[in-house]
């Protein structure tokens, strides 16, 4: 999971900055609070995507405007979407910590990494098998594209 968030950290951070979001430690903590609440709301409503493989294959072939419309209609605000938001926020926070830590940044000695690992663990606790791993990866990749394409 850490490999995943590290691989998307710079991209997540750049997108958040472009969208005017607060990427500071406190901004990321506040965002995680919101995303966790939205996750539980989606779970309580039973909001989920039935076959993410099929939808992902279809969505990734679409031009940007059509992709955004499909994501908004079929994936946005589902439990998987909110888990992706949690991972993306953790990745954004990781990039903030890395850049703030300078050349000698050591994640093992970073309070930011220690704290953001709770968000990663929250997502990991929702994964019960390979299908969940694949779902998180597919939705996270689509969510990154969706975030890059939308305003604010």
Name every feature range the model reports, one short phrase each.
Residues 1-152:
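Flexible "arm" and connector segments at domain edges
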């Amino acid at each position: 999971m850490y490999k995943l968030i590290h691989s998307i950290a710079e991209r997540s951070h750049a997108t958040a900055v472009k969208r005017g979001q607060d990427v500071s430690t406190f901004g990321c903590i506040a965002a995680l609070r919101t995303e966790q609440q939205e996750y539980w709301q989606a779970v309580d409503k039973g909001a989920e995507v039935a076959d993410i493989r099929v939808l992902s294959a279809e969505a990734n072939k679409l031009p940007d405007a059509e992709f955004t419309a499909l994501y908004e209609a079929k994936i946005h605000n589902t439990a998987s979407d909110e888990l992706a938001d949690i991972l993306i926020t953790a990745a954004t926070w990781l990039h903030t910590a890395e850049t703030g830590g300078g050349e000698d940044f050591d994640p093992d000695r970073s309070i930011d990494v220690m704290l953001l690992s709770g968000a990663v663990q929250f997502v990991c606790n929702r994964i019960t098998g390979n299908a969940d791993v694949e779902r998180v990866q597919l939705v996270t990749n689509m969510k990154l594209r969706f975030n890059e394409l939308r305003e604010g």
